[in-house]
Structures are given as structure tokens and as C-alpha cells.
Amino acid sequence: MKPPVILINYKAYENSYGKKSIEITKKIEKVSKEYGTEIIVSVPATMIHRISEESELTVFAQHVDSGEQGARTGAILPEMIKDAGARGSLLNHSERRIRLDEMAESLERIRVLNLESVVCVDRYELVLPVALLRPNAVLIEPPELIGTGIPVSKAKPEAITKAVEEIKKTKDVYLLAGAGITTGEDVFKAIELGADGIGAASAVMKAKEPEKVVEDFVKNAIKAMEKRGE
């Protein structure tokens, strides 16, 4: 994982699984190859193996459970997603919250397995406590803006700038910004404010031409990083 980080969360939209999921993945992969930029796709557990086999994108799970292997019906463990082909996992999304102790345990096992992790938080005050658990990145997403099309970089720029101040107190943990990220301009602004990348979902998954949305994201992410001299 290296900036600019572009993470697309497939969630559980109708095109997040099956043939439609493969189609949108291929479109995203084309953009990734054209611009030489890594794009992370966080996909349903049932699609991890298929997407990792049929594309060269970095595939993440959307969640993993804490706890050991054993009599744990329905659990999705780090060992399982690695075996399926995932290279990491999203954790603690506002739609799938977990306790801090569960987060710490999952992150430890993710590291042992040489997987990567992106942990979501809903406010800047949580950035440092979570970053101290040593994920690869912390994604700040004010929940009231998720799925609204109102970007955090415009509606709450201070959430990003304050989060940047917090992440600088740690080492080797990236800061991503999400919630309402819809256009390349939103991406540019988020990175200009100090984020190392972005997370998005509905802007891509609900788009008529998702490849154009992703291309807009990537072009502006690259431009913003160049402006920062990185």
C-alpha cells in the first residue's frame, strides 16, 4: 500500500456479487493498469476468491471477525480471507462496528498473516488511538455524510486536517478520507488537505459509467500528490 490510496468498497450492492461484480472489477482494473496506480477493492466475502483469481487488483475483505479458529459458526477469520486470496481487510466500517478489543485482536492476527488493514473511524479523536494499534491506514468517515454525495472534504474539511495532525503523531500509518466522495475534485481536495488517499463506495457502485468515476478519482489523486511534491 502506498499513496495515493484509492479504496473502493463494493458493500452489498446488487452489482457487488456475481457477473456484475466481475464486470465492474474489470473496468476498475483497466483504469488501475492505465495509470499504474494501485486500487484496492473491498468486496463481499463470497467474491474474494473469484475476484482475486480474475483480476490483478488488490482485494480486501470488508470485515473479519476476532477470535480463534474452531467452533465459531458463521465467523469470517483472517486465515479464511487470506486463503481465499485477499491481501487485507477493511475493519470497523460504520455499517459494521466492532469493539476496540476486537479490533486489536484482529489487527494482530492480520499482521501475523502478512495481510494489510484499513480501519474506519467516525471522528478525528479516534484517529490516534486506532493508529497506535498499527493498521496500515486509518480511514476517517463522518457517518452522516456516507452515501450522501456531500464530500467530507467540502462539508467537514476540519475533520481531515485534524485527523492529519493526529496521524502525524504515529509512524508508518496512512490517513484516508471518505464519506460522500463523489468526484475527482473531492479526491483532490482531500489529498490537498493532507490525506494519503480516499475511500468511496456508492459514487462508483451506483454509477452508470463507473470506470469514468474511478479514472477521475485516480487522475486527481495523482495530480494532488504531485502538487504536494510526493
From Swiss-Prot:
Keyword annotations of the record? Cytoplasm, Gluconeogenesis, Glycolysis, Isomerase
Q: Which PROSITE patterns does this UniProt record tie to the protein?
A: TIM_2
What HAMAP family does the record point to?
A: TIM_A
Q: Cross-referenced SUPFAM superfamilies, in alphabetical order?
A: Triosephosphate isomerase (TIM)
GO cellular-component term (any): cytosol
GO molecular function ontology, one term from the record: triose-phosphate isomerase activity
An example GO biological process term is:
glyceraldehyde-3-phosphate biosynthetic process
- Catalytic positions are H93, E141
* Compartment(s): Cytoplasm
Q: Give residues annotated as binding substrate.
A: N9, Y10, K11, I146, G180, A201, S202
What the protein does comes down to: Involved in the gluconeogenesis. Catalyzes stereospecifically the conversion of dihydroxyacetone phosphate (DHAP) to D-glyceraldehyde-3-phosphate (G3P).
What quaternary arrangement does the UniProt entry report?
Homotetramer; dimer of dimers.
The answer on whether this UniProt entry bears the keyword Cell membrane reads no
UniProt lists the family membership as follows: Belongs to the triosephosphate isomerase family.
UniProt protein name:
Triosephosphate isomerase
Identify the Gene3D superfamilies for this entry: Aldolase class I
EC number, UniProt record: 5.3.1.1
The root-end lineage is:
Archaea, Thermoproteota, Thermoprotei, Sulfolobales, Sulfolobaceae
